């Protein structure tokens, strides 16, 4: 094998290793405006928020103009909110409008996570 061919193969392998890979995330679809209600808070009276609040979030609320305008994201089973990119929010809105579910909008999202945002490749309501 020539030196040039070896360098090409090494470059290809290095490029593939540096490529971002898609991650599958499961949770509940919510709008950003309401996501703060689901954040877990420890109070003197007990714990508030969390997945119970996220699952109770309604389709009707998610379709309100202010909630649509805020964009969407996923509240994960480890109690974190990942905001969708603009294209992901459009996909989420289409899925919510097409769904007959009234609440508990469980979803599987595949995409690239960067910080607290996910660039959505695919989204499926369960």
Region locations from a protein language model:
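OB-fold and OB-like single-stranded nucleic-acid-recognition modules
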Residues: 21-126
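C-terminal segment of classical bacterial N-terminal signal peptides
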Residues: 15-21
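Short N-terminal leader segment in a subset of presequences, especially plant chloroplast
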Residues: 9-12, 30
């Amino acid at each position: 094998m020539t030196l040039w061919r070896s360098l090409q193969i090494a470059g290809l392998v290095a490029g593939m290793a540096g490529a971002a890979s898609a991650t599958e995330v499961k949770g509940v679809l919510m709008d950003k405006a309401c996501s703060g209600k689901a954040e877990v808070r420890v109070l003197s009276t007990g714990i508030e928020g969390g997945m119970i609040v996220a699952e109770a979030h309604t389709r009707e609320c998610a379709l309100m103009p202010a909630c649509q305008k805020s964009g969407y994201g996923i509240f994960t089973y480890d109690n974190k909110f990942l905001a969708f990119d603009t294209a992901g929010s459009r996909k989420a809105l289409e899925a919510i409008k097409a769904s007959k579910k009234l609440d508990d909008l469980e979803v599987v999202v595949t995409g690239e996570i960067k910080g607290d945002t996910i660039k959505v490749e695919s989204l499926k309501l369960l």
